[in-house]
Amino acid sequence: MKYRRFGKTELEMPVFSCGGMRYQHKWSDIEWSEVPDEGQKNLEATIHRSVELGINHIETARGYGSSEMQLGPVLKQFPRKKLIVQTKVAPFATTREFLDNFNTSMDYLQLDHVELLS
């Protein structure tokens, strides 16, 4: 895999990313029991193969429905330093609303930080 420096940071980004818009089972928050086993296994295999190929930038968003929730258990299977995780949170009228949504993302992703937030 080829990597490029991300802007003026020291972050080495793969030239390909693993985008999470289509990871979700639904475009809304759902209960874990609603996620089909086959779909979750496919997501897990996709992420494992991506990381195996050097595609370690995993991108998702709060607005991608169940994507973050489904990614959380998969991301835990990798050494944290091996991944570059990015999520996105829409702007809100208040700081409290923004933080509530960001914290929901972090809870679903089962992470204590993300490398990139947009």
Describe the function of each predicted region.
Residues 78, 82-99:
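Structural motif corresponding to the early beta-alpha repeats
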Residues 27-35, 48, 93-118:
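Glycine/proline-rich, positively charged
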Residues 55, 86-88, 115-118:
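Short beta-strands and strand-loop turn motifs
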Residues 1-83:
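N-terminal binding-site loop/beta-alpha segment at the start of enzyme catalytic domains
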Residues 70-73, 88, 97-104:
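Generic beta-strand or strand-like secondary-structure segments
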Residues 22, 62-64, 89-93, 118:
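Active-site-proximal loop/turn and secondary-structure-junction residues that shape catalytic pockets
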